[in-house]
């Protein structure tokens, strides 16, 4: 055999061996893509927080008038498992929350299901759900005016999973050719009384809500409705559309009928105002060539307090605290605390807000490192919160976050009268 023939034979054998190895190495395993009968995931979280208290703030005075402090430390351990059991077309889904918090003043624990519901899907276009479900209505990142049947987000941590409500819900989806590509209808029934969904609203009612989703000319549109019952009747819509591959615009609008607001004068005289209210949101999301993500939103809260109403409440708290110091009588402070729980002390109780979040992916080529900055401003009184944070996920199934929250504002402003002036937080999560 000549050298040429030997080389040709060797090349042929090598090619056959390589082909056989490739066929063996890249064999498609369909079982790897089959749905498992049971799935389990979640995370364990350790969180340490340090609070610098705002001793001149109205909310601080309500909570610490008889126990003055300058700082608080809080350690929290959280276990959040989630899973799914499948049996044919049915499944049982859950997301639990087990939490223990050790604070300077004592310990608090909580154990609950954020979600626990059965689901039946006999057809890809039909789903029936029953149980405790956490819905996500609305396109806004920090706020959702049309989130009629869900709990309010924390704008400082809007991606945190929320607790759901117990309900019966369905989902019907149909796809088409043409400008209208998808239609989805989601009706639901949400009972509320002293025993079930007791914090959804007032009275004992069977509430009916629905959402209609349309994908029309590459624009996502939702029409939402909630019947009159535990909460007053409300309806609205949202939309989202990509203006470019790296630029998205979104918005929401909601109309709430016969809303009630309790407002107080500086002397403590409380009145209830009634009337319809409109809330809306408009936002942009932009991704730059440097992998920097910008989220900008404007939110108008039609149910919120005016600047004057907030200042009257602050003056009432100051007067109540002065009476307590002079007489030891805390009756006015107790009344002010009830008003705070009803609206004044809730997150973002004002009328007009701006939200900006800037996130930079892996700056200076530091892998798995993501710094971010969040700013929330009350545009009526000029007070703001500024939240810088650092996120690192370079270890397998592990995430570390360090962030600080700084509140700025003068006397009588929303963030200037809060319980804290700053907060430092370290969080570690182990996912499984």
What is the role of each PLM region?
Residues 46-52, 85-89, 98-102, 134-136, ...:
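Transmembrane beta-strands of outer-membrane beta-barrel pores
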Residues 71, 103-109, 160-162, 196-206, ...:
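Solvent-exposed loop/turn segments connecting transmembrane beta-strands
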Residues 88-94, 125-128, 177-183, 216-223, ...:
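Repeated loop/turn-to-beta-strand initiation elements of outer-membrane beta-barrel proteins
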Residues 170, 354-358, 418-432:
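Outer-membrane beta-barrel "beta-signal"
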């Amino acid at each position: 055999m000549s050298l040429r023939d030997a080389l040709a034979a060797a090349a042929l054998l090598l090619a056959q061996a390589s082909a056989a190895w490739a066929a063996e190495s890249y064999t498609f395993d369909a079982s790897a893509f089959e749905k498992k009968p049971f799935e389990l995931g979640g995370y364990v979280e350790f969180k340490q927080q340090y609070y610098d208290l705002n001793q001149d703030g109205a909310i601080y005075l309500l909570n610490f008038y008889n126990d003055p402090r300058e700082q608080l430390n809080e350690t929290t351990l959280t276990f959040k498992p989630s899973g799914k059991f499948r049996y044919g077309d049915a499944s049982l889904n859950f997301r639990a929350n087990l939490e223990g918090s050790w604070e300077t003043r004592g310990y608090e624990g909580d154990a609950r299901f954020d979600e626990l519901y059965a689901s039946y899907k006999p057809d890809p276009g039909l789903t029936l759900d029953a149980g405790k479900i956490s819905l996500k209505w609305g396109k806004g990142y920090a706020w959702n005016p049309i989130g009629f049947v869900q709990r309010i987000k924390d704008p400082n941590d809007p991606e945190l999973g929320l607790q759901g409500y117990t309900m019966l819900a369905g989902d019907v989806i149909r796809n088409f050719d043409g400008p209208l590509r998808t239609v989805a209808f989601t009706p639901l029934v949400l009972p509320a009384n002293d025993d079930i969904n007791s914090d959804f609203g007032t009275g004992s009612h069977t509430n009916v809500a629905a959402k209609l989703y349309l994908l029309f000319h590459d624009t996502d549109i939702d029409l939402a409705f909630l019947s009159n019952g535990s909460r007053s009747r409300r309806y609205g819509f949202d939309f989202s559309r990509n203006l470019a591959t790296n630029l998205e615009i979104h918005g929401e609008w909601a109309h709430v009928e016969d809303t009630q607001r309790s407002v107080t004068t500086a002397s403590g005289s409380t009145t209830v105002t009634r009337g319809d209210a409109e809330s809306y949101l408009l936002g942009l999301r932009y991704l730059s060539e440097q992998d920097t993500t910008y989220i900008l939103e404007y939110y108008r809260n039609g149910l919120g307090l005016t600047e004057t109403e907030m200042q009257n409440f602050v003056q009432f708290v100051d007067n109540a605290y002065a009476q307590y110091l002079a007489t030891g009588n805390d009756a006015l402070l107790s009344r002010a605390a009830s008003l705070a729980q009803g609206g004044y002390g809730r997150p973002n109780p004002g009328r007009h807000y701006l939200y900006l979040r800037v996130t930079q992916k892996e700056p200076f080529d530091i892998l798995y490192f993501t710094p971010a900055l969040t700013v929330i401003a009350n545009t009526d009184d000029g007070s703001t919160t500024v939240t810088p944070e650092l996120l690192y996920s370079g270890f397998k199934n592990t995430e570390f976050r360090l962030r600080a929250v700084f509140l700025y504002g003068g006397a009588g402003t929303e963030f200037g009268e809060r319980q804290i002036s700053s907060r430092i937080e370290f969080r570690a999560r182990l996912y499984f």
